[in-house]
Amino acid sequence: DYLNATFYNDFIVDSIIRMFSDRNSIVIYFSDHGEEVYNFRMQQGRTDIKTDDPRTMRYQLDIPFMIYASPRYAASHPHTMERIKRSVDRPFMTDNLPQVIFDLLGVHTSYFKPERSVINDEYRQQKRRLLQVGREYL
């Protein structure tokens, strides 16, 4: 059932974080979908998608996205940690995740576009996030 799957996912994510917690490392996690589970009303699942209620859209469409930094990583990369903290409330689409990874690793390539890395000071939300034809998700 859904609750057991959520508990198992939490167990796996926690295990991975513990595995890397004593190294100079980061762990990136994101979910494959959002889910409303009694967040502000007696409702569960991804229904009611045609509504314009921002709370409904937030809980059903936003996905968890997390960057965990080990204490060693945080201590040795304070500038990167500040950039991560500044990015917390920025809208982001996971198809730009490779840009974030390039940025975190300091990869210098013509494929790196800093304006597409949510943790970069040059980040610009470029893509329209569409719910349906003619309906944008803000």
Segments predicted by a language model, with ranges:
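Catalytic domains that recognize anionic headgroups
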Residues: 1-138
